[in-house]
Amino acid sequence: MRVLVLAVMAIVLSGTAARAADPRYPDWPCTQAKVPEISLAAVWAGPPLDEVQSKWKDHAKISALVAKLSARKTPLDEAEKLVKEFLAASASDKTANAKLLFAGLFDTLNAQRSQVINGLERVSRKQREAADKIREETLALQALQGVTPRDDAKIEALSNELIWKTRIFEDRHKVVRFVCEVPTTIDQRLFALGRVIQQEME
């Protein structure tokens, strides 16, 4: 039982030790630095988008293409091919369509990224609460073990509950580590598609 208590504490402490590497973002659980939004200048070196930024939604074909290109289930090489085919068929409207397409991608992927970041921070807060609860229950278990006479049924029930909560905590921790990669993947997709759009405009 002492081994269980030590193992639980080790798992909880390891799961929360890396939290809040940047004091500006106390709920950010990832080792990667938190970048709340993608900067347009970091992913687009083409002509200014000011006049088209809010107009891409008015074009049904472009809106549908943006949705397909933004979906993570669409492989990047397929997305790049779709961009080339769309712009090749745009003829005299190529520059205007290219700008609308990128404006749509920028808006959509930035919004996706914000949802992922907000979700990660929500889970991080839940993990902190779970870690606090597990610590409390571990101390309660230690106290029960020191009481004479021992209430073995109560000790076993609390031990089983701790094992269950620790397993959930560990599973969430693994998911968070995986999801921490998603904002970077979105950045890379936007940069790659922006580069293809700019190349097709030239």
What are these model-predicted stretches?
Residues 5-15:
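Bacterial N-terminal signal peptides
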Residues 19-94:
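N-terminal Sec/ER secretory leader and immediately downstream segment
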Residues 88-117:
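Short, charge-rich amphipathic alpha-helices with coiled-coil/heptad character
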Residues 116, 123, 127-145:
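Non-transmembrane amphipathic alpha-helical segments
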Residues 153-202:
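Alpha-helical oligomerization segments
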